[in-house]
Amino acid sequence: PVDSDTELNRVIPVIAGLRDAGVTISISIDTSKARVAEAALSAGANIVNDVTAGRADADMFSVVAAASCPYIMMHMLGEPRTMQDSPSYSNVVMEIRAYLSERISAARDAGISDIIIDPGIGFGKSVEHNLRLLAHVEEFAALGVPVLLGISRKRFLGAITGVEAPADRDAVTMMMHALLADKPVDIIRVHNVRMAHYVFALKSALHSAS
């Protein structure tokens, strides 16, 4: 992890530069620090993505509530440096569902209404855990807020397919997205936007013909 000043020096010039250049698409700031989130929103970001779901900084909820912006809350087991050290759950789907349900309630109590949840594929999960979460993603959709999945180029895809280099995992990423196309997922996070567009254009065409 880096400190707030380092994060600010890295991201604020980029966000401000994009807005100054006339870029109008939504920008999401990925941070667990309220100070960084507030500055990024002031510079032109529209969305806050917090991998700790508000647990790392007690001021995060108030910053997001004041901005009335979308807030992405993710599940992560432990800390980034240790999260993949033998992650263990009794029931990975139900435990993460309960965690996200509690975080939704806490965020709403703080005045946040535009909430998106992310089960945190690859963040403190084994290959088996990740697959179970994807197979039962409807459990998260049942919480009544949009569901985001970030599986692009993840290590578990490489473990299953033998594709070692992350940059070479676009094809298997898109295959998994195609398999998940009928699941109740609202947002996907990808590296290769063009290939993702092809997948969902084909899905739409096929559904239109049925």
Each model region followed by its residue ranges:
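Active-site-adjacent loop and "lid" segments of alpha/beta metabolic enzymes
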Residues: 1-26, 31-35, 41-42, 46-109, ...
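Active-site metal-binding loops of divalent metal-dependent hydrolases
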Residues: 121
